[in-house]
């Protein structure tokens, strides 16, 4: 696909005079364009759901979720991956974000990194990619060689693959087994795909990881019951989670959390089933960590 023919490289008539308007009008133009992004994502919800089901199946079988991207796309993958351990209590290596150019590229532009097909393959080899893993290639343009080569290599290994881009019929979409293509149109600043395209990608990644965690029993109701208390805010959140899930008071919630080494799931089962920590943990283990199953089946 030629660069000049890509939707993400097109000219947006709504912002053609943006350098001549007031600051407030400038903000309104950007905001009006941003409003279209969730609607673009809504149109691809069936594709997102299909990807979540595949990711969950692979992760349940011992695989990992691997994000692969360059520039903004790579940074978004790293952002999503880095939030999973504290939010859902998963091991750091379960969701991995890879960016063209390596760690230095998180804060700096690395010339030519996104054009390196070898880089995409090598980065996957360096994390010992296996057929159990799912590789999600992220590229607003859908033409990034680093991502395309990574997806090709992943498919050769037998991995399930997902391609996220904002141009229909892109190489990323056709290379991956599953394509998620929210069409957000031309950017306010021509070609600045960190804007609407980046926002769309962030929304999609939010759904992929959150959907995976919900289906993995990391959420009870709408509570993040595997959250790790790494700071005072999260310490308080744990107490509130146990309170909200059980109807107990703060003192009871804190006592249960202390008794089970601050594991929200165990504390919730302790309170709801009137069990000690060891028995509550045992029942959770018997049901794969799903609170709902412990409550419904016993």
From Swiss-Prot:
GO biological process: 1,6-anhydro-N-acetyl-beta-muramic acid catabolic process; amino sugar catabolic process; N-acetylmuramic acid catabolic process; peptidoglycan turnover
Entry annotation: catalytic residues: 83 (proton donor), 114
Superkingdom of source: Bacteria
Record keywords, A-Z: Carbohydrate metabolism, Lyase
Record's protein name: N-acetylmuramic acid 6-phosphate etherase
Pathway it works in: Amino-sugar metabolism; 1,6-anhydro-N-acetylmuramate degradation; Amino-sugar metabolism; N-acetylmuramate degradation; Cell wall biogenesis; peptidoglycan recycling
Keyword hit for Lyase: yes
Further remarks about this protein from its record: A lyase-type mechanism (elimination/hydration) is suggested for the cleavage of the lactyl ether bond of MurNAc 6-phosphate, with the formation of an alpha,beta-unsaturated aldehyde intermediate with (E)-stereochemistry, followed by the syn addition of water to give product.
Subunit (UniProt): Homodimer.
Family designation: Belongs to the GCKR-like family. MurNAc-6-P etherase subfamily.
EC main group: lyase
Organism annotation: Escherichia coli O139:H28 (strain E24377A / ETEC)
Cysteine-cysteine disulfides: none
Induction note: Induced by MurNAc 6-phosphate that releases the repressor MurR from the DNA. Repressed by MurR in the absence of MurNAc 6-phosphate.
Catalytic activity: N-acetyl-D-muramate 6-phosphate + H2O = N-acetyl-D-glucosamine 6-phosphate + (R)-lactate
GO molecular-function terms, A-Z: carbohydrate derivative binding; carbon-oxygen lyase activity; ether hydrolase activity
Functional description taken from the UniProt entry: Specifically catalyzes the cleavage of the D-lactyl ether substituent of MurNAc 6-phosphate, producing GlcNAc 6-phosphate and D-lactate. Together with AnmK, is also required for the utilization of anhydro-N-acetylmuramic acid (anhMurNAc) either imported from the medium or derived from its own cell wall murein, and thus plays a role in cell wall recycling.
Record-annotated SIS domain positions: 55-218
Keyword Kinase on entry: no
EC number: 4.2.1.126
Alphabetized InterPro entries for the sequence: Etherase_MurQ (IPR005488), Glucokinase_regulatory_CS (IPR005486), MURQ/GCKR (IPR040190), SIS_dom (IPR001347), SIS_dom_sf (IPR046348)
NCBIfam families for the chain: N-acetylmuramic acid 6-phosphate etherase (TIGR00274), PRK05441.1 (NF003915), PRK12570.1 (NF009222)
